[in-house]
A protein has these predicted regions:
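PLP-dependent amino-acid enzyme catalytic core
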Residues: 6-181
Length: 181
């Protein structure tokens, strides 16, 4: 519950800022990628040109991982891979999982995350608060071991009808998301 209250307060703060520009949004997903550019002055003062950075903390999940989660799920919807009742499956150490869980919840999909045993309990609990089912997998096994979070995600994807495995580490949409948004 505390997480929901926090997210709502943060979104209210973001909306206050964005409404000053006469912009409004239909839902929290429309805030993803609409992060401000900040000019870097001090760290680039000895370099020619102007340099900017995106302030990713203004994404609802406070991370650039929101961009990839939304972009990959939107593309899967366009391709007909996701429909009502579909399940999203992903491997994560936390940030991407949080974003995938948040976007899945808001789009109405079930979310299953295979998480390394190195992930903090706080991150795991936050993902659970967003409705994700969590499979904690040992971190001290090779990636091709059936118990690894990679292999658990692959197995679940094969076993669960109407599921989509995002596979962020090998998905070209991961990189594309940062150019598109």
């Amino acid at each position: 519950m505390w997480l929901l209250v926090f997210l709502l307060k943060f979104v209210a703060y973001q909306n206050d800022i964005m409404l000053k520009d006469n912009r409004s949004f239909n839902n929290i997903l429309e805030l993803i990628g609409n992060t401000p550019l900040i000019k870097l002055n001090k760290v680039t003062e000895n370099f020619p040109g102007s340099y900017f950075t995106k302030y990713e903390a203004f994404n609802p999940g406070h991370s650039n991982k929101d961009r990839i989660a939304l972009h990959i799920l939107n593309e899967a919807e366009k391709k007909g891979l996701l429909k009502n009742g579909s399940t999203i499956i992903e491997t994560t150490s936390g940030n991407t999982g949080f974003s995938v869980a948040m976007v899945s919840l808001l789009k109405g999909y079930k979310c299953i995350l295979a998480v390394s045993s190195k992930a903090s309990k706080d991150k795991i609990n936050m993902m659970k608060c967003l409705g994700a089912d969590i499979y904690v997998c040992p971190s001290n096994v090779p990636s091709d071991d059936p118990r690894s979070y990679y292999e658990v995600a692959k197995r679940l994807n094969n076993e669960i009808k109407d599921s989509v495995y995002i596979n962020q580490y090998f998905n070209e949409l991961n990189v594309e998301a940062h150019y598109q948004t």
